[in-house]
């Protein structure tokens, strides 16, 4: 069922993420809401990010970690965190909740708060952030599209006996909190996870212990271990609530030739398992395309004589158009005004062309995209789109980066 955007109440709730790396992972969108919200609630991973939020906020700030306590059930803390934000929403304030990482990934109070706010008739939305998994992809250097990827929370994996796939990448979250419902993290139940991993992969298979660096002074943890190593007390002591396991694929998943033929893919079994570069973590059985094989050398040789397609479009927009689009992206209050009275905002913006005004007044992505791009020949000849052509423009699909060559 689609979420209704029609509300009759003044309070609003936005939930955002601060990412993992201190300050650096805060998006421009999140920063704009920090600057403009009446109330900013946060639970972040380091004091530098906390200071950055407080220094940039124009409203009042509140640290939600106050609701944690050593032997207190975490669920109770989450309910309280959610409710204090909702109280300000109900009081008519613009409320921002900032959570460590991605606000919707392994975060309970964010989803609860948004659902309750919407049920009560308030505007509520979530902004994306950089999760531990995003950071892990970058640091460990693998693409989940190659081999596929499964992702589980450690305790849930065990309790619900979720399937692990030896032919895919596997990510296991919160390995330092197996069976823990409070704030006491002693790894007392960690051996149960090791039993499961040994059963599915064997004792000699690789597991990478990962923790993304937070402060500028922090060092990223990327420790390559075997599953057998996980039974050593000195190793177990290294795991904490921010620890994540990456388990690379052990087995090759062979192509189904009959399906490959139906898809028009010839010689599927001879294709490399992955594009260059080879994984740092998988074994030698996984073949990889060469960095400079015959095909690569051939296409590289064509770079200097390459000519762009005649229908290739480049950025072509007035200074006013570019500034207004930037402001709409980074100024929540202006965006709200634009959506409430589009024509007034457009008319108040000087320097727009007739086509740009027409596109903006339609408040549709397709026309806006169309008037901001043009072919070099159209620019040289002074050809402009007609208003009818602008109105009929549709939003182009994003370019696809295909896995197989």
UniProtKB/Swiss-Prot annotation:
CDD domains: OphMA_like (cd19916). The active site is at 74, 78, 100. The modification N-methylleucine is found at residues 402-404. In the N-terminal section; belongs to the precorrin methyltransferase family. Pathway: Secondary metabolite biosynthesis. Keywords: Methylation, Methyltransferase, S-adenosyl-L-methionine, Transferase, Virulence. It comes from the Eukaryota. The keyword Transmembrane helix does not apply. Residues 1-250 are annotated as: Methyltransferase domain. Residues 376-398 are annotated as: Precursor leader. One of its GO terms (molecular function) is methyltransferase activity. InterPro entries: 4pyrrol_Mease, 4pyrrol_Methylase_sf, 4pyrrole_Mease_sub1. Its EC number is 2.1.1.-. PocMA automethylates at Leu-402, Leu-403 and Leul-404 before being processed by a prolyloligopeptidase which likely forms a peptidyl ester upon removal of the follower propeptide, which then undergoes macrocyclization with the N-terminus of the modified core peptide. Peptide backbone alpha-N-methylations change the physicochemical properties of amide bonds to provide structural constraints and other favorable characteristics including biological membrane permeability to peptides. This is Methyltransferase/ribosomally synthesized type I borosin cyclic peptide precursor pocMA. The keyword Transmembrane does not apply. One of its GO terms (biological process) is methylation. S-adenosyl-L-methionine binds at residues 100, 102, 105, 132, 174, 212, 243-244. Residues 251-375 are annotated as: Clasp domain. Homodimer. It is an enzyme of class 2 (transferase). Fusion protein of the methyltransferase pocM and a type I borosin core peptide; part of the gene cluster that mediates the biosynthesis of a type I borosin, a highly methylated cyclic peptide with potent biological activities. Type I borosins derive from the C-terminus of the fusion protein, and it is the same protein that methylates its own C-terminus using S-adenosyl methionine (SAM). The C-terminus is subsequently cleaved off and macrocyclized by a prolyloligopeptidase to give the final product. Within the homodimer, the clasp domain wraps around the adjacent subunit to position the core peptide into the other subunit's active site for iterative intermolecular methylation.
């Amino acid at each position: 069922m689609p979420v209704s955007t029609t509300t009759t109440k003044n309070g609003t709730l936005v939930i955002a993420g601060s990412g993992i790396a201190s300050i650096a992972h805060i998006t421009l969108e999140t920063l704009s809401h920090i600057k403009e919200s009446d109330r900013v609630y946060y639970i972040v991973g380091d004091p530098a990010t906390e200071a950055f939020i407080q220094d940039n906020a124009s409203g009042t700030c509140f640290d939600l970690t106050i609701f944690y306590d050593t032997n207190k059930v975490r669920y109770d803390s989450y309910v309280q965190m959610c409710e204090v934000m909702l109280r300000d929403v109900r009081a008519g304030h613009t409320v921002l909740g900032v959570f460590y990482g991605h606000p919707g990934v392994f975060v309970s109070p964010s989803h609860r708060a948004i659902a309750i706010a919407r049920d009560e008739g308030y505007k509520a939305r979530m902004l994306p952030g950089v999760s531990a998994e995003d950071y892990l992809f970058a640091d460990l250097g693998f693409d989940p599209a190659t081999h596929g990827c499964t992702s589980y929370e450690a305790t849930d994996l065990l309790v619900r006996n979720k399937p692990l796939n030896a032919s895919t990448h596997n990510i296991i979250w919160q390995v330092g909190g197996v069976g823990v419902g409070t704030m006491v993290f002693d790894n007392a139940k960690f051996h149960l996870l090791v039993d499961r991993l040994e059963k599915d992969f064997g004792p000699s298979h690789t597991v990478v212990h990962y923790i993304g660096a937070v402060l500028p002074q922090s060092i990223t943890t990327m420790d390559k271990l075997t599953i057998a190593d996980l039974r050593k007390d000195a190793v177990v002591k290294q795991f904490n609530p921010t620890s994540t396991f990456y388990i690379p694929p052990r087995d090759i998943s062979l192509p189904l030739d009959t399906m490959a033929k139906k898809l028009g893919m010839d010689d599927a079994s001879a294709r490399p398992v992955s594009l260059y570069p080879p994984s740092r973590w998988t074994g030698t059985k996984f073949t990889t395309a060469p960095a400079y094989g015959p095909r690569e050398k051939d296409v590289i040789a064509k770079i200097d004589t390459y000519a762009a397609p005649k229908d290739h479009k480049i950025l072509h927009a007035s200074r006013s158009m570019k500034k207004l689009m930037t402001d709409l992206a980074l100024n929540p209050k202006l965006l709200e005004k634009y959506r409430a009275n589009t024509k007034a905002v457009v008319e108040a913006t000087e320097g727009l062309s007739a086509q740009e005004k027409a596109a903006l007044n339609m408040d549709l992505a397709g026309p806006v995209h169309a008037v901001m791009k043009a072919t070099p020949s159209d620019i040289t000849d002074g050809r402009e789109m007609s208003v009818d052509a602008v109105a009929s423009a549709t939003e182009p699909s994003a370019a696809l980066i295909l896995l197989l060559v």
